[in-house]
Amino acid sequence: MSETGAKRRMDRFDPSIEPKWREFWAREGIFKAGRRAGAPRRYILEMFPYPSGDLHIGHLKNYVIGDALTRYYVIRGYDVLHPFGWDAFGLPAENAAIKYGRHPREWTYSNIAESKKSLEIAGIMYDWSREVTTCNPDYYRWNQWLFLLLYRKGLAYRAKATVNWDPVDQTVLANEQVDAEGRSWRSGAKVEKRELEQWFFRITAYAERLLNDLDKLDRWPENVKTMQRNWIGRSEGAEVTFLALPPGADLYAPPPPDAEPLVVFTTRPDTLWGATFMVLAPEHPLAPKLTAPERRAEVEAYIARARMESEIERTSATREKSGVFLGSYAINPVNDERIPIWIADYVLMGYGTGAIMAVPAHDQRDFEFARQFGLPVRVVVQPPGETLDGDTMTEAWPGDGVMVNSGPINGIPVGKGEGQSVKAAIAWLEAQGKGKGTVTYRLRDWLISRQRYWGTPIPMLHLPDGTIKPVPEDQLPVLLPEVQDYLPKGKSPLAAAEHWVNTIDPETGQPARRDTDTMDTFVDSSWYFLRFCDAQNDREIFSREAARQWMPVDQYIGGVEHAILHLLYARFITKVLYDEGLVPEDEPFKALFTQGMVQRRVRTPLDIVAPGMVRFPEELRRKLELPAEAQTVDQARALLKERGYTLEEESDGGLTAVSGPVTMSKSAGNGIPVGPFVRQYGSDVARIVVLFAAPPENSMEWTDEGVAGAQRFLNRIVALFGPDRDEIAAMVRSGNGAAPEGEDRALYRKLHETIRKVTLDTEQFRFNTAIAALMELLNEASRYRAEVGRVTPVFAQTAATFARLLSPFAPHLAEEVHSWCGGTGSVYDAGWPEWDESALVLDEVEIVLQVNGKLRGKIMAPAGADEEQLREWALTNPRVLSFVGDKTVRKVIVVPGKLVNVVV
């Protein structure tokens, strides 16, 4: 067979070409940062993962998006930093290790090796020389350094607090790690409340900056910024100090010396004169002291119940109000009235001060509570044109009006502006020394202590006299010791490692005990992007020069689920480091892209027990609460339909229950391992499916049809350009740059339209439409090649340019086509094509013909036709003439290049 004949049989994409190109990229360092000295820089980063072992296709989307963008900027001549690492400490690794009976370290490093293999076979190219693993001492040493920095600045502190306790994982959780239903972010267990000594980072000191600087992030999704604004939760109002009298105090006598100040934050200080009782959160530290002896049993039982409830349950608007009177009273500072003090679960310790002054006439929750327990309702705002009566009101009035029964602010209109009630009340409180205007936040300090083994040891020493001091910096890292028993027991497993816990204070030589808690894994991820700038530095966390060179991250890519966890913490730590002069800007990520998920239907075969009779498998029965008894096929179909499933018949006669699209995961059983898929189909096929199926911010469904479509596209590229590769290469080398004429003109125009569209779409993350444009160009090139019957300069130019345009999306085939076109070296050194604006000018344009503004026909006309020519063609057009008839033409409106409207 002749060589030409052999080449003509090249009609499909062969995935076996991929390994040689991956080896080539690694050998040549194509994607190593610093390769192009002096070139403009880009830092592109995907959120690093927990090492969970062999990756499935669902994991790939995040990385494929980042890789496509990286390849685009590399071929454009940028010096790109695209690093990778492993978020290896924390509960996910430890729980999995416990489940499989392996040490967390062994499990973690084994999974890192497997995951890395999957990424490499998928053709995701990183600068592996900057790889970080957070459980390595050379990384967590700097976690400890960061802790000591915050400690010196007064931003790390230890305090007793009511904390979220996960009874399954046996550890505390930050507020951000408890979902809206009061469940743990990892175990799903109902979170309990406990009083414990814990370490905190004072993120609230940065609350105002974290809030205001969201306005600078104009390339972040609005929904992420809104979530952070709501979580920070800024409120303006006043702090007012009530005086809580001890139980049994004489209500008519002056307050005794042991009366307790009770600080309240309110956004409506103008309604203080309407307060008829006070409510404390069940966790309030003064609640036990203010409880009368005869009420103690009831109060303690109520507090115990409240600790078991989630915040969303406690604050539900539809829930019947509950509470207990403590048996003590407080003095309202604006009128010296004695009002009863209650505890109720609708007041949260985590917001404001954990105490409220209740104004039932003007707050619906307080109103419902007052009606439930027969407490007085006093009106202090009268709405326009109405007269409210506290005894007959059926709901609170929270709206506008005029202040009444309010002493010095009577008659003032309600509002927060100048001359309105809120500012007037604050001015009066400050003048009287009874309160002050203030701002408060929903945001609470970041609780970083964890009572688990697999984490960064906290570098603090506990001395015999009860004091706590930091480990000197030159003693870092405090190494995580090897222990035999790392199962959770409610206190850190490190506490049992006596050989490690008992140490010597290096500064005094006195005995000391190490802190036995470990750090929240979100500390590890709060600064890892900075370590990538200088990952091999063993003298400092990173150099200022490296940070100036690369920071901030130009494009960050990851899931929206991290909006109020990782992303908020990373912004906080970056601001702290900026204040220390270590980083050039106080925001870590210029642009954020949140990708959608990869979904796939779950298919579960049913057991056929007799002709026309089936039984649901046990796992499906449990999951969907289906009957155990055998069902007819129609009964089974109906039961599945009620649960959002369909029943499909297989080619072998079997029956399968098919779910709707479900996020791909190991637990759902619908993951496709990366390795076997890539070996069979090629990573370029996987990449095209992921990038083409839907806009990347949306979730996409992985289907067999999508895989087949991606294969067809790549096969057509091979079939079109492969057989002619020698002729194409020769013509590209000859460099015929003459402007195309005649039949070549349409392909040349389509080529430059495609360059423009792929360029703009790639920069806007519209990968699906960029690939669609390449498919259109392929169609046009195929039509042209069939009609012309030979390789021409414009066809050769199209092939060479196509390889470069394809390179972000199907990089292995792009390199192959580039080599067919005579390219030496990598396609990523060939440069991104520029479009020719003059090529986009059409020879002919479509002109719409109208009569009295209604469409009556269309004609093709030369692009430069003047008004007179267009007018003449319109007035002689048979379709136009048939609608004009014998009517007089009053005027002709011509819009060159677009339309002619004949008015009769």
UniProtKB/Swiss-Prot annotation:
Annotated GO MF terms: aminoacyl-tRNA deacylase activity; ATP binding; leucine-tRNA ligase activity
Location of this chain's protein in the cell: Cytoplasm
GO terms, biological process: leucyl-tRNA aminoacylation
Known catalytic reactions: tRNA(Leu) + L-leucine + ATP = L-leucyl-tRNA(Leu) + AMP + diphosphate
Binding-site positions, ATP: K666
Main location as per UniProt: cytoplasm
Gene that encodes the chain: leuS
Protein family per UniProt: Belongs to the class-I aminoacyl-tRNA synthetase family.
Matches recorded under Pfam families: Anticodon_1, tRNA-synt_1, tRNA-synt_1_2, tRNA-synt_1g
Domain of life: Bacteria
Membrane listed as a keyword: no
UniProt-listed Enzyme Commission number(s): 6.1.1.4
Protein name per Swiss-Prot or TrEMBL: Leucine--tRNA ligase
Motif mapping: 'HIGH' region: 49-59
Motif 'KMSKS' region, chain ranges: 663-667
Protein keywords: Aminoacyl-tRNA synthetase, ATP-binding, Cytoplasm, Ligase, Nucleotide-binding, Protein biosynthesis
